[in-house]
Swiss-Prot record:
Documented EC number(s): 1.3.1.-, 1.3.1.91
Gene it is expressed from: dusA
InterPro entries: Aldolase_TIM, DUS-like_FMN-bd, DUS_fam, DusA, tRNA_hU_synthase_CS
Cofactor: FMN
Organism of derivation: Shewanella oneidensis (strain ATCC 700550 / JCM 31522 / CIP 106686 / LMG 19005 / NCIMB 14063 / MR-1)
Name assigned to this protein: tRNA-dihydrouridine(20/20a) synthase
Highest taxon above the source species: Bacteria
Length: 335
């Protein structure tokens, strides 16, 4: 009845995905991203098992429009992870992903994230526990190594061990993580990228679905990686320059639909914003994710400034978004 074969994860199109990013990839950002790309696989922020099982809020809320959508879990207790995976499947998530890549001290203190690379048998046990109770893909996001344990053999031992319990999809951040001495931000920038190691992994494990993450800033770079791998996961660039998503379907996925204009994206966001405001939400909960929409264009500064100065004010409504767009048009005319 349950899907426990190694190819489960190939049921989803993994050509392009947006990385789970704490404080960034919340449900408002994901709705915004989905407007621009129908094909991108979206990920939640990492949610800990403790938050889901014992927290007061509902950490699994999302909009139906966000599909396909994966829940990223942080944890290392197989029983708790299985409970959370089952809840995710019952709520309609399309995938559960285990975080084995975050190097922050807080995450390490909870015994999850990148430090779990040193315990591949435990990761395998966690994957197995989740796969036993769900029929959606269970995947792992990890690094190419940790600290001085950064040999190719270390990575393949990890892959072999976790794969043996049925994990058929790995998202590899092509940097190792330093567990001490670097901040999470520094761990995304200082350890050198080694794309060739991830390419080699795909050559050695052709049956696995392998996506690459780390330092990817354009769809042209994504196309290059896709010559070697099954998928590309983009993080910061997809947030800071979100309009790159508007061409994902056409450039990477073969869509013949017209590329959505920035103006059309803004117009499509207005009903969503209004609905959020009507239930007591604040405008800046949503517009903070839209700040980079005009990245690289004349008017980008005017857009950012107007939203930053006005969206947080009490009573701010959609007129703020409209006026911000007018300021962009004024700058464009001035050019």
């Amino acid at each position: 009845m349950l899907k426990n074969n190694i190819n489960d994860s190939k049921n989803l199109d993994r050509t392009f995905s947006i990385a789970p990013m704490l404080d960034w990839t919340d449900r408002h950002y994901r709705y915004f991203a989905r407007l621009m790309s129908a094909n991108a696989l979206l990920y939640t922020e990492m949610v800990t098992t403790g938050a889901i099982l014992h927290g007061r809020g509902d950490y699994l809320t999302y909009n139906q429009e966000e599909h396909p959508l994966a829940l990223q879990l942080g944890g290392s207790n197989p029983v708790e992870l299985a409970r959370c995976a089952k809840l995710a499947a019952e709520r309609g998530y399309d995938e559960v992903n285990l975080n084995v890549g975050c190097p922050s001290d807080r995450v390490q203190n909870g015994r999850f994230g990148a430090c779990l690379m040193a315990e591949p048998e435990l990761v395998a046990e966690c994957v197995d526990a989740m796969k036993q109770v769900v029929d959606i893909p269970v995947t792992v996001k990890t690094r190419i190594g940790i600290d001085e344990q950064d040999s190719y053999e270390f990575l393949t031992h990890f892959i072999d061990t976790v794969m043996a319990k049925g994990c058929g999809e790995f998202i590899i951040h092509a940097r190792k993580a330093w567990l001490q001495g670097l901040s999470p931000k520094e761990n995304r920038e200082i350890p050198p990228l080694d794309y060739d190691r991830v390419y080699q992994l795909k050559r050695d494990y052709p049956a696995l679905n392998i996506s690459i993450n780390g330092g990817i800033t354009s769809l042209e770079q994504a196309q290059t990686h896709l010559q070697h791998l099954d998928g590309v996961m983009v993080g910061r660039e997809a947030y800071q320059n979100p309009y790159m998503l508007a061409q994902v379907d056409q450039v990477l996925c073969g869509s013949t639909k017209a590329v959505m204009s920035r103006e059309a994206v803004i117009e499509a966001m207005l009903p969503y914003i209004e609905a959020h405001l009507q239930v007591g939400g604040r405008l800046n909960h949503i517009t903070r994710h839209m700040i980079g929409l005009f990245q690289g264009l004349p008017g980008a500064r005017a857009w950012r400034r107007y939203l930053s100065e006005n969206a947080h004010k009490n009573g701010a409504g959609i007129e703020v978004v409209k006026l911000a767009y007018q300021s962009v048009q004024t700058d464009l005319v001035a050019q």
